[in-house]
């Protein structure tokens, strides 16, 4: 998925009134201000209350199919268009205390909404993205791939974050 595709999806969501936050590899590239590698999908964080306009926006883009990947959950699943467009969707609930809840009722996580209020750019277009700290944390919750090693090293270097042991 190239930058034009990512921006087309984000622009469509914005026109629909959906407040989307870029996550994953695109978040790191947005924080770095440049695309550093190819991406197979666009991770997007969206409040569950925006699901209806999000679905309408996705259908207009042809993002109307589920992409089973083995870890599908009601709050995290992948949709695609049968071609190059693929979105890894992360739905959360806004809490009254300024945090968000991500996950199920029994096994979810609450975290500060500020983690989803980072600022970055994709092709010089300003986008909301994960904060540097949160992007780093999200990349350490699973066995790292080769691209994750490069992403994390670049992120830590730019924002002077300590490099996690698994990435040394």
Description of each model-found segment:
Residues 1-168:
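Compositionally biased terminal segments of proteins
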């Amino acid at each position: 998925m190239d930058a034009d595709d990512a921006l087309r999806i984000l622009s469509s969501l914005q026109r629909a009134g959906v407040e989307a936050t870029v996550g994953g590899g695109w978040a790191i590239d947005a924080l770095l201000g440049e695309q550093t590698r190819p991406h197979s999908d666009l991770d997007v964080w969206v409040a569950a209350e925006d699901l209806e306009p999000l679905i309408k926006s996705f259908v207009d883009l042809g993002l109307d199919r589920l992409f089973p990947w083995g870890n599908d959950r009601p709050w995290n699943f992948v949709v695609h268009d049968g071609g190059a467009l693929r979105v890894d969707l992360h739905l959360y609930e806004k809490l009254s205390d300024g945090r968000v809840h991500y996950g199920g009722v029994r096994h979810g996580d609450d975290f500060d909404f500020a983690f989803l209020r980072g600022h970055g750019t994709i092709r010089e277009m300003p986008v909301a993205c994960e904060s540097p700290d949160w992007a780093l944390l999200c990349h350490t919750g699973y066995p790292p791939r080769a691209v994750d090693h490069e992403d994390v090293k670049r992120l830590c270097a730019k924002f002077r974050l300590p490099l996690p042991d698994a990435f040394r």
